[in-house]
Amino acid sequence: MKFLVNVALVFMVVYISFIYAAPEPEPAPEAEAEADAEADPEAGIGAVLKVLTTGLPALISWIKRKRQQG
């Protein structure tokens, strides 16, 4: 079980680092002001939680199947 927890933590760190490492184009000053006014800080957290709740159980079940096979 400790192995699965370690694998899950590594998966999370790698996935989150890819999200934050992606380059984004510079927005125009007008668009940036509009985006700041409409920004939703909870949107990013929701996306991460969605990945964790859907991807992590699938990864764990895949690892369990591979361990049972070999």
Swiss-Prot record:
GO MF term set: porin activity; protein kinase inhibitor activity; toxin activity
Signal sequence, start to end: 1-21
Marked site positions, Important for the flexibility at the center of the helix, flexibility that is important for the stability of the voltage-gated pore: 57
The keyword Signal is assigned to this record: yes
Tissue: Expressed by the venom gland.
Chain positions found as Glutamine amide: 69
Keywords, sorted A to Z: Allergen, Amidation, Antimicrobial, Cytolysis, Formylation, Hemolysis, Ion transport, Membrane, Porin, Secreted, Signal, Target cell membrane, Target membrane, Toxin, Transmembrane, Transport
Compartment(s): Secreted; Target cell membrane
Main location: secreted
Any single Gene Ontology cellular-component annotation: extracellular region
Oligomer status and interactors: Monomer (in solution and for integration into membranes), homotetramer (in solution and potentially as a toroidal pore in membranes), and potenially homomultimer (as a toroidal pore in membranes).
Entry similarity comment: Belongs to the melittin family.
Protein name: Melittin
Organism of origin: Apis cerana cerana
Organism phylogeny: Eukaryota, Metazoa, Ecdysozoa, Arthropoda, Hexapoda
